[in-house]
């Protein structure tokens, strides 16, 4: 199995899996993200205790890429401090813009590395970054 097949499989698994797609009870933060160009629409909900992201989940609809990206991001940020989560977001967005190519710097992204070449499909970039921008907005506005 080649790397592209593994990446495609990971995206499909996360987009179909419901383990991060559910409403949270009494979230501390709730932020809606919308991509008007393709209709992706998510609401990201986060519980924070002592500056640590204790729990996160999302609800909404969208393409496989937006749904998988949201799920993978949530797996990454759970248990991290808010600052660590924002560092991960910044690294992810820099990777998407091809500003980072150093493999060691990208290790922090774990499974989200599957989106590294999404910029080769410009119409899909907004799908991949929706949850990440939504997280940034959620934290800024809280």
Set out the residue ranges of the language-model regions.
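Domain-level signature for proteins that mediate thiol-based redox and metal-cofactor handling
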Residues: 1-142
